[in-house]
Amino acid sequence: WRYNHPDATQTVYLQGGIHGIELTGIPVVHEFIKEIEEHQLAYNFICVPLSNPMGLDSQIMGVQTGYNNIHTNQQNCWNWNRISNLKDEPSQEGHWIKTLLDLAKPADIVLDLHTAGVEAVPHIYSHVTEVKHTEGLGIPHVLAWSNRSYSFADTHHQLGKIALTFELSSSRVVRSEWMEESLI
């Protein structure tokens, strides 16, 4: 999904569901799309609500069964946290990863939404030089890294972009008021 504002000077790339079964980011991105359309935000946006549809195949009735493809029992153990290392893989996953990286190329700001887990509090991963960009986002906990990690966010940080990874609520509990708080 793309949105282009005539006065925009920056482009934001927003994705959810890169780990497939981490479902929280998917409805959050959909809600954010509604906000963009309603408020005509002065940015260009590239939104990918479900950035890893193949990853949905590693669960049965909402429970993760591991990283094997349920239908073929072949290991799909791609570490999507280290996405830049996989972009040249001659596989469906490698092609998809390259597509995601290409979609994010024009972005000045890259936001990657994940699911924190049942007992974790929402938090943001940020490079130490980008912590200032996390202020005022409504998530008080920030984990900063300094070493190269090859994550989706780090790959874009290395290209000079603002890149943040959001670890949101549990995928089993997504409340609309939480989404509203995060979107405002």
PLM-predicted stretches and their roles:
Residues 1-184:
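Structured catalytic-domain cores with a bias toward divalent-metal coordination
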